[in-house]
Each structure stands twice: as structure tokens, then as C-alpha cells.
């Protein structure tokens, strides 16, 4: 598939450019037996992402949480790209578990909360060395693939540990006064995740029934569809934003560093940056640095 070829080409370019600018790729040494417990794998991934209750509460939005997690991974030379032209029904995420510069691909057409969930899902594949293309990384997944279901469960535990959510005041409110979207919104806000993730946790904690979970999930899905239909079309993204969101800051910085060090030409740089014109390099630099 063309996407696989593109991301492999980007990784090859990164390795070449690191050599050109005198950098050594970091080893991604975290490796976990796939037979380990879900709790153990989730804890390891939270440590990789440097997530804790205080940090998560400071995010307030899935956008900020996603940005933080991607930046944290890029510090370890994990390449995080975003596909721009693929429908989420075809691919939610993709991962390739290299020992150096492992690759995670998210789908830019997904909402930030969905991309955050997918990022955690793909990290499970990376640390257990079970990478591949994932078409069903939603927290409400009905996938029959046992590994994919496990990855979804672990992703939920990474973002919302049971030990943390049971202490949340709104859990007590739900148990005392009954289910209310206001309580769900408050919990989702504090963990910077979607409402869907939270109601899945409520089901797992036996606070709501399976039937009520799916009824609420369907209602949220319909509300989301209505919201999407009301949103005005944003048209085309500016060239810099288009390139930046697809290749990520680590990749963009590396290419520009090589260019400013006279290791590659402007034409080469443009090619590495999805044919971004040289006049836009400065804007990309301000975004990436």
C-alpha cells in the first residue's frame, strides 16, 4: 500500500538525515511480553507517555493531551505521522515496531480524542512487538480480533486508570443521584478523553448496565453525527498546516536542520516535506521549533 511505502520512505530519510547532521537514533528498548497483564502493560505505557493524574487534569482537552503525548514520544525518536487521505473506516491507526525509530500513524480525519485513543492502542502494539494496520481502534469496538480488543482495553486503562476514576467525585454523584451527562462530561474533561471512553469505564466498573451502555453510546454517536453535519466545511488546509500535521515536528525539524546545515538542497527539502514550497520553510520552522 502507498501509505506503508511513504512512511517507510520517511523513516529511511530520517535515518539518513540523522547521519548527515551527526545524530544517533535512540534505541526504543521498551519491550513487554504480550502475555503480561493488561494492568502491567497500561502502567508501562503511562510511564512512557509520562502521564499522571495531575498532568492529565491540566490538559482539559483531548487536543492538548494528544499534543503532549506525541511530543513525549518524539523525544524518544518515535515517529508519529498522520494520514490525510484515508477514511477512518479503512484505517484508524498503524504501527511498525522498529528497535530504532518505531512508527505510529494516526488518521487525521479522526477527532483528537479518537486519535489519542488510537495512539495508546498503537503503543500497545509497539511495546509488545505486534504491530500492524488497525481498522477498529474505537473504545466501543465490537471487533472479534482478540488482540485488537485487548489493545483497546489497555488503551482505555492508559487514559483512564480504574484506580483514578473510582476516586472521581462525579462517580459518587452518579452512584448517589443516578446517571447524568453532566457527570460524564466532568469526568471526560478531567481525563481529557471522549465521553465514549468514560461510559465504557462505567460499564466495566458495573456502574451502568451493558444495555444502558450501548443505548447511551448510540445516543452519543447520533449527537456527534448531528454536530458534524452542522459544522461548516473548512475547505483546504494551508500548505504548512497540511504538511506539518502529516509529518510531525520531529521529522520536520530534522529535515529543516539538515537544510540549514547545507546537508541537503532546497529541492530535496521540499521533496522530504511533501513538496512544500521553499517560501514556506520559515513558517514550518516556527511551528516545529
Language-model segments: what does each one mean?
Residues 1-289:
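Active-site hotspot residues in diverse enzymes, especially metal/ion-binding acidic/histidine motifs
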